C-alpha cells in the first residue's frame, strides 16, 4: 500500500470513529453540556465513550490543541470536564448562577493523561427542605444551571420532588375530593417540603392553580435533563399522608393524627393513613401510576413515614410490619421499585428508636436490595456506626452541613475526610454512596464540592491542606500567594469545626435582654469556635491578592459580613452585661458600635448577588400570573425566612439569612427599636419593658411579610472591595485590641 493512500484511509477511519463517538447518546448529552458551560472551548474538546459500565470513570488527555474527555457515560465525562476546569484552568463553576465561570484565554493542556474512577456507585444530593429554603421560586434557567453543576460534581441520584402536587391533585380529584378541599390542604409554596414530609397541612394555602401547572411543566424539564446526564431522579412515593376530608369519601378509613409539629395549631396537624389497610395500597398505586405517566420513572422513590413524628406504636413487630406493607404497596405499583428513606428520624428521635431492636425491625422487614438509606448527618452523628452498619441494608454517607439556609461560615474539612475514609474502611459492603443533604444553599459551597470529590479516587482529597491550596488557586484564577494565605487561615479556623442547627450571628436574632427560651429564640446559635482575628487576617490577604475574579469578590463580602457579625455577637454580650450592672456609659458606647455595624453590613451585602433578598422576592413574584398571585408568592417567600409561620412562632428565625434589604429593614430595624426602648427606660429611670417591646416587634415582623414592606434591589449595587477596605480600616483597632493574642 502506498504511504499517502494509507494515511488517507487512516484519517478516514479516525473521522468515522470520531463521528460514531459523537453520535453516541451519552456524548450528545455531554456535548450539549459543554456548549452550555464552556462554549468558547467547545470546538477543541473531543468526547469519547469508554466501553465499560461496571464502574464510573473518566480520562483526560491533550492531543495537540484538542482536549480528549473520555467517560463511560455523560455524568462521568462531566466530572472529567470539571476536573479539567478546577485543576488545569484554575476555574470554578459555581452553584450560584450569577457567579460566572472565568476561563483562561488560551485553553490549558493536560501534560499527562488523567484517569479517575468513582469509589462509590451512588452520589446523592438534596434534601426535602432545600425545595423550600432555596428552590421554591426557581425557573428553568436556574434549574438548568444547577443540573449542570450537579453533573459536573458527579451527582447521579438527585432528589426530584418538584410538581408532585399536580399529581396529587389528579389523584385526590379522581377519588372524589373537591378543588377547594385539595388546594386548601396544601401549604404555601415555600412550606411545601414540610407538608410533603407529613409535618403540616394548610398553612399558607390554598395553592393557586397556576402554581400546580407551572411546577408540573417544570418537573418534566428537570427530570428529562437529569436523565440525559445519567442521573436517576428520586421521585416521591405515598407515605400515608392524606387530606382529613378523605373520611367524607371513606368514612371508615383508619386515620391517625400525627399531632403537633413545631407549635402549629391543630388545624395544621397531619392525618396518617394506616399502611396496613387496603386503601393505602390503592392510593399508592394510583399515585405512582399517575406520577410515571407525567414524569417517567427510574424506579427509585423517596418515602419517609415517620419523619420528626411519633409512630402510632413502638412495638418492633408493628414497625417491621408497617415498613413491609409500605414496600409491598410500592412494589405492587412498580415491580422494580426501590425505596429510598432518610434516617434523620433514627438520630432525631434516638431515645425511642435505639431500644428493643426497633431500627433493625423497621429496616430489615423486606428485601435489603430494595431499600436505600440516607445516613443524613454523618459529619456529626453517623448512624451507621450506631446500627451495625444498618444491618446490611444499603446506605449512603451524607454530609448535611446547613440548617435552614443560614448564612454562617462553617465547615469541618478534616472531620469529613476522616469520617468518609472510616466508612470506606469499616462501613461494610452495603456502604454504596456519598451524598449531601443540605437544608439550603449557604455561603460554604466548598464543603459540598469537597464531599463530592471524595467520591472519586483523587488522592489530593486525602491531603486537605493541599486541596485547600488548589481551591485558593481556583478562587484566584491563578497561583496567588495572598489568596493561598487567606484560605489556609480559613481552613485552619472556620472550616475545622462541625456545623450545628441554627448557626447565625446575633444581628439576625430578635433582640432580647432576657431568657431566649421565653422569647422563642430556640434555633439561634451565634457561637463560633475560632478567633475572629483570623477573619480579619484572611480579609487582609484577600484584599492584597493580585486578581479580580468574581469568586474573590464573593469571598471578600462573605468574610467581611461574618467578621462584623461575630463582632456584633460578642458586643451583644457586653451590652447585656452593662445593662445588668447599670454601667450605662459602657452600654451607650457598645450600642454606638453595634449600630455602626448594622449600618455597615447591609451596603456590603448589597454588592454581591448571592446576598440579596431582592432576588428571592423577584423570583417569587415572577411565578405569579396575576398581581394577586404575585403578592401571595412574595408574602410566602418573606415568611419562610423570617417568622416561619405566624408571629412569634417556634421556628422564628430558623431560616435567617445575611441578605441585603432583609438586614436593613428587618434585622437592623428591630435592633434600633430595641436600643431606643432601652435608652428611654434608662432615661426615665424604670426597668426596660421587654414584654411590651416583644409584642410590638412581633407585630412589625408580621407586617413585614404580610404587607410586603419596602422594595428591594434584585441586582448588586456598589463596590464590595472598596467597602471591605473601609470596614477593615474602620474597625481594625478595636478588633485588634479585642481578639489579637
What spans do the regions from the language model cover?
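C-terminal motif of bacterial Sec signal peptides marking the signal peptidase cleavage site
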Residues: 15-17
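Second-shell loop/turn segments in exported
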Residues: 66-71, 132-136, 209, 314
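Active-site-adjacent substrate/metal-binding segments within catalytic domains
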Residues: 120-139, 150
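Sec-dependent signal peptide recognition
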Residues: 2-9
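Catalytic-core regions of glycoside hydrolase
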Residues: 42, 92, 98-107, 126-130, ...
Amino acid at each position: 500500500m502506498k504511504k499517502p493512500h494509507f494515511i488517507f484511509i487512516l484519517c478516514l477511519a479516525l473521522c468515522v470513529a470520531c463521528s460514531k463517538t459523537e453520535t453516541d447518546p451519552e456524548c450528545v448529552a455531554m456535548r450539549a453540556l459543554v456548549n452550555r458551560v464552556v462554549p468558547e472551548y467547545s470546538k477543541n474538546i473531543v468526547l469519547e465513550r469508554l466501553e465499560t459500565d461496571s464502574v464510573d470513570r473518566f480520562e483526560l488527555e491533550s492531543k495537540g490543541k484538542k482536549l480528549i474527555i473520555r467517560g463511560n457515560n455523560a455524568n462521568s465525562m462531566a466530572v472529567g470536564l470539571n476536573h479539567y476546569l478546577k485543576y488545569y484552568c484554575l476555574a470554578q463553576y459555581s452553584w450560584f448562577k450569577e457567579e460566572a465561570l472565568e476561563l483562561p484565554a488560551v485553553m490549558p493542556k493536560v501534560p499527562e493523561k488523567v484517569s479517575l474512577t468513582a469509589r462509590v456507585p451512588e452520589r446523592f444530593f438534596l434534601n426535602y427542605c432545600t425545595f423550600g429554603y432555596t428552590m421554591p421560586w426557581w425557573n428553568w434557567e436556574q434549574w438548568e444551571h444547577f443540573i449542570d453543576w450537579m453533573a459536573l460534581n458527579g451527582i447521579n441520584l438527585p432528589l426530584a420532588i418538584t410538581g408532585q402536587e399536580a399529581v396529587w391533585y389528579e389523584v385526590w380529584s379522581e377519588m372524589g375530593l373537591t378543588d377547594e378541599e385539595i388546594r386548601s390542604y396544601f401549604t404555601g409554596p415555600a412550606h411545601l417540603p414540610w407538608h410533603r414530609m407529613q409535618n403540616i397541612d394548610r398553612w399558607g394555602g390554598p395553592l393557586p392553580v397556576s402554581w400546580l401547572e407551572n411546577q408540573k411543566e417544570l418537573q418534566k424539564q428537570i427530570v428529562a435533563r437529569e436523565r440525559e446526564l445519567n442521573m436517576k431522579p428520586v421521585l416521591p412515593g405515598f407515605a400515608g399522608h392524606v387530606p382529613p376530608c378523605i373520611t367524607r369519601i371513606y368514612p371508615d378509613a383508619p386515620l391517625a393524627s400525627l399531632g403537633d409539629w413545631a407549635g402549629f395549631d391543630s388545624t395544621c396537624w397531619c392525618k396518617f393513613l394506616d399502611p396496613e389497610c387496603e386503601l393505602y395500597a390503592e392510593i399508592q398505586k394510583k399515585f405512582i401510576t399517575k406520577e410515571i405517566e407525567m414524569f417517567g420513572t427510574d424506579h427509585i422513590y423517596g418515602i419517609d413515614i415517620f419523619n420528626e413524628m411519633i409512630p402510632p406504636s413502638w412495638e418492633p413487630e408493628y414497625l417491621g410490619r408497617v415498613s413491609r406493607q409500605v414496600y409491598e404497596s410500592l412494589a405492587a405499583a412498580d415491580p422494580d421499585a426501590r425505596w429510598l428513606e432518610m434516617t434523620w428520624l433514627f438520630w432525631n428521635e434516638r431515645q425511642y428508636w435505639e431500644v428493643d431492636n426497633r431500627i433493625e425491625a423497621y429496616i430489615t422487614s423486606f428485601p435489603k436490595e430494595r431499600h436505600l438509606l440516607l445516613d443524613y448527618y454523618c459529619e456529626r452523628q453517623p448512624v451507621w456506626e450506631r446500627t451495625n452498619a444498618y444491618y446490611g441494608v444499603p446506605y449512603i454517607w451524607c454530609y448535611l452541613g446547613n440548617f435552614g439556609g443560614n448564612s454562617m461560615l462553617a465547615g469541618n474539612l478534616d472531620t469529613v475526610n476522616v469520617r468518609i475514609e472510616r466508612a470506606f474502611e469499616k462501613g461494610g459492603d452495603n456502604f454504596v454512596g456519598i451524598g449531601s443533604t443540605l437544608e439550603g444553599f449557604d455561603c460554604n459551597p466548598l464543603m459540598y464540592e469537597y464531599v463530592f470529590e471524595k467520591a472519586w479516587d483523587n488522592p489530593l482529597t486525602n491531603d486537605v491542606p493541599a486541596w485547600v491550596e488548589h481551591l485558593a488557586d481556583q478562587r484566584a484564577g491563578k497561583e496567588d500567594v495572598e489568596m493561598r494565605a487567606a484560605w489556609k487561615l480559613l481552613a485552619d479556623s472556620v472550616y475545622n469545626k462541625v456545623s450545628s442547627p441554627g448557626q447565625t450571628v446575633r444581628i439576625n436574632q430578635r433582640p432580647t435582654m432576657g431568657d431566649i427560651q421565653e422569647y422563642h429564640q430556640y434555633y439561634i446559635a451565634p457561637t463560633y469556635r475560632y478567633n475572629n482575628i483570623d477573619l480579619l487576617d484572611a480579609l487582609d490577604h484577600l484584599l492584597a491578592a493580585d486578581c479580580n475574579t468574581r469568586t474573590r469578590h464573593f469571598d471578600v463580602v462573605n468574610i467581611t459580613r461574618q467578621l462584623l457579625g461575630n463582632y456584633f455577637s460578642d458586643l451583644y454580650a457586653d451590652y447585656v452585661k452593662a445593662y445588668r450592672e447599670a454601667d450605662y456609659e459602657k452600654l451607650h458606647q457598645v450600642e454606638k458600635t453595634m449600630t455602626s455595624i448594622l449600618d455597615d453590613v447591609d451596603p456590603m451585602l448589597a454588592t454581591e448577588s448571592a446576598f440579596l433578598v431582592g432576588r428571592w422576592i423577584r423570583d417569587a413574584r415572577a411565578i405569579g400570573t396575576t398581581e394577586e398571585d404575585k403578592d401571595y408568592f412574595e408574602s410566602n417567600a418573606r415568611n419562610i425566612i423570617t417568622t416561619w409561620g405566624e408571629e412569634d412562632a417556634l421556628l422564628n428565625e430558623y431560616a435567617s439569612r445575611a441578605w441585603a434589604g432583609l438586614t436593613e429593614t428587618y434585622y437592623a430595624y428591630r435592633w434600633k427599636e430595641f436600643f431606643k426602648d432601652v435608652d428611654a427606660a434608662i432615661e426615665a429611670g424604670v426597668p426596660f419593658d421587654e414584654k411590651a417591646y416583644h409584642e410590638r416587634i412581633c407585630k412589625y415582623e408580621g407586617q413585614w411579610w404580610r404587607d410586603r414592606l419596602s422594595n428591594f434591589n434584585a441586582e448588586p449595587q456598589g463596590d464590595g472591595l472598596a467597602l471591605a477596605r473601609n470596614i477593615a480600616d474602620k474597625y481594625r483597632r478595636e478588633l485588634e485590641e479585642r481578639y489579637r493574642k
